[in-house]
C-alpha cells in the first residue's frame, strides 16, 4: 500500500490469472493459459491482514466473476467493510446476488464489454454474448439500483463492415431504452457510457498478423459514433484518440529497430511529436498494407523468441 500510485492506498488482490473465454483479440487469454484461480480463503486472509491499513480494495483478474467462489469473496470483503472495486464484469456472469452485494456498499456504476454491436461480429471474435443476453443483463443491472453502465466496444475489428459500426448505435439505443425504463420505475436517472476503442492487434493471439485499420477509417468511424450519440439523451460517448491507437499498435508489433523511438518517449518526448517525426517508420509497422514480417518474408516475428509459459 502506498499513496504514490494511481490507485492510492487501495489493496489490490489478484484472484485469478488467465481467462476461459479465449476472445481472439485478447493477449491475456492466450498468454496466461491455463487459467489459475486462487482460493477464497487465501484471498480473504490477505484482506483481513490488510484491513487495519485501508478500507479500499480492488480485485485483479481478467474475468473477475468467473472465479467459482466469487460470491463468497465479495461477501467476505463486504463483512470486513471493504469498499470493493471491480474493473468490469463478464456479461454472462452478471447475477443478482453479486449486484446486490455491490449495491449494498453504495456502488452505482458497472462496466461490461460487449466489444461489438451485433452477434455476427461477436461470434467472429469468439465473444459468446447474444443480443438477448446483453439486454437481459443490462435490465438486471439497472433493476438492482445501478445508474451508470459503461460499455467497452471496438471499431476496426477484422471483417468489420459499416453495418457493424451502425449496429453499435442500434445496440446502445436498445440498452438506453432499458436504462430509461428501469430508471423511471425506480425514480432514478440512468446513463449509458459507450467507450469505443480501436482494435489493436496483439502478438500471441489469433489476430497477431492483422493490421491496424487506417487512421482515416478509424477517424470516420469514431466521428460517426460521436455524431450519433450526441443526439441521444442519457448517453455519454467516450472515443479513443486515433493517435493513441497508432502508438499502441506500434508498441505491440515493433521490433528492436524502434529502440531509439522508445528511448525518446522515455526521456519525455511527447507521443504526438514522435508520431509526426517518425510517421513513415511507424506506418510500416501498423498500416493495413503491412502485415507481420513473418507472414511476408518468412522471417521470425519480433516476438517469436518470447515464451508464453
Predicted regions and their residues:
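Anion-binding and metal-coordination hotspots
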Residues: 4-8, 33-36, 107-109
